[in-house]
Amino acid sequence: MGMRMMVTVFLLVVLATTVVSLRSNRASDGRRGIVNKLNDLVPKYWTECCGRIGPHCSRCICPEVACPKNG
């Protein structure tokens, strides 16, 4: 009887650990999706290119007020 109880407890622990792991992975995927959507809404090189020409930017992509012409 003791061995059967230990096996049952072990299987319950494994099952609980698996469920918690799967749920946390799904939650992190959701957060990653939200972050990716936000990144798509904001121009990729906004800070690198604002007010000057950067390595990935051929023109200023900020509004005129926030992007004074340099020289």
Swiss-Prot record:
About its domains, the entry says:
The cysteine framework is IV (CC-C-C-C-C).
Provide the family line. Answer: Belongs to the conotoxin A superfamily.
UniProt keyword Secreted present: yes
Query: Which key words are in the record?
Result: Amidation, Disulfide bond, Ion channel impairing toxin, Neurotoxin, Secreted, Signal, Toxin
Q: This protein's superkingdom?
A: Eukaryota
Question: Record's Gene Ontology CC terms?
Answer: extracellular region
List the protein's name.
Conotoxin Bu24
Task: Report the main location listed first in the record.
Answer: secreted
| Residues spanning the signal sequence | 1-21
Hey, what tissues is this thing expressed in? Expressed by the venom duct.
Molecular function GO terms recorded = acetylcholine receptor inhibitor activity; ion channel regulator activity; toxin activity
Q: Where in the cell is it found?
A: Secreted
Does the record bear Secreted in its keywords?
Answer: yes
Quote the PTM field: Contains 3 disulfide bonds. They are not indicated here, since framework IV presents two different connectivities (I-V, II-III, IV-VI and I-III, II-V, IV-VI).
Give the pro-peptide residues: 22-44
Give all Asparagine amide modified positions.
Answer: N70
Disulphide bonds annotated for this chain are: none
